Amino acid sequence: MHVKKGDTVIVNAGKDKGKKGRVLAAYPKKERVLVEGINLVKKHSRPSQANPQGGIVTQEAAIHVSNVSLIDPKSGKATRIGYKVLDNGKKVRYAKKSGEVLDK
């Protein structure tokens, strides 16, 4: 999967197209990501110890990974991802537009 937790992404398709957000969680087996402030849904929750009031809660729902693109740290625009092996043998992701290494 080309995105990881903590990456900043832009949404390519759907009702939140064009919005930017940070990846909160990645689910590789389901090919989905949870993005901060994107795909908000209302859930009905029962009163519990954590939420004694209960009621309707707004939260993020996961979207398919193909509907997001990583944002290039240099230009701030959407970019594709490539992989390369550094001299020390570490495999890292890099932005195709700028060549900037994304993994530390």
UniProtKB/Swiss-Prot annotation:
One of its GO terms (biological process) is translation. It comes from the Bacteria. One of its GO terms (cellular component) is ribonucleoprotein complex. Keywords: Ribonucleoprotein, Ribosomal protein, RNA-binding, rRNA-binding. GO terms for molecular function: rRNA binding; structural constituent of ribosome. Pfam families: KOW, ribosomal_L24. One of two assembly initiator proteins, it binds directly to the 5'-end of the 23S rRNA, where it nucleates assembly of the 50S subunit. One of the proteins that surrounds the polypeptide exit tunnel on the outside of the subunit. Belongs to the universal ribosomal protein uL24 family. This is Large ribosomal subunit protein uL24.
